[in-house]
């Protein structure tokens, strides 16, 4: 059984027991979170595809930790002008352990 959920502007394919790094959520470590925006659920009964979301579909999980992704470097050059601009960015994330998928 698996599902496709939408959170933080991205889509994730999840199964019970998976650990997923999603965009930062307002939840403490150990707290349960529910994802209501379920796009697809595949189970033994068949596939349920939402238009856009599966009605009654829900994925629950537990927040494991909060963290930050590795730094990415942004560099802009102006050719032949001896000009360079550097910046860096680290995106926050929340790691979630998927517990249950229900339709």
Curated annotation (Swiss-Prot):
One of the protein's GO biological processes: translation
Ribonucleoprotein keyword on record: yes
Record keywords: Ribonucleoprotein, Ribosomal protein, RNA-binding, rRNA-binding
GO molecular function, one term: structural constituent of ribosome
InterPro entries named in the record: bL21-like, bL21-like_sf, Ribosomal_bL21, Ribosomal_bL21_CS
Pfam families: Ribosomal_L21p
Family listed: Belongs to the bacterial ribosomal protein bL21 family.
Function: This protein binds to 23S rRNA in the presence of protein L20.
Subunit structure: Part of the 50S ribosomal subunit. Contacts protein L20.
The name this protein goes by in its record: Large ribosomal subunit protein bL21
Gene: rplU
């Amino acid at each position: 059984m698996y599902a496709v959920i939408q959170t933080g502007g991205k889509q994730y394919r999840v199964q019970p027991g998976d650990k997923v790094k999603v965009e930062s959520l307002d939840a403490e470590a150990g707290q349960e979170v529910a994802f209501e925006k379920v796009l697809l659920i595949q189970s033994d009964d068949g596939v349920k595809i939402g238009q856009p979301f599966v009605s009654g579909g829900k994925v629950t999980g537990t927040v494991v930790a909060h963290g930050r992704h590795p730094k990415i470097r942004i560099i802009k050059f102006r050719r032949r002008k001896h000009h360079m601009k550097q910046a860096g960015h680290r995106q926050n994330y929340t790691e979630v352990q998927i517990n249950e998928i229900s339709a």
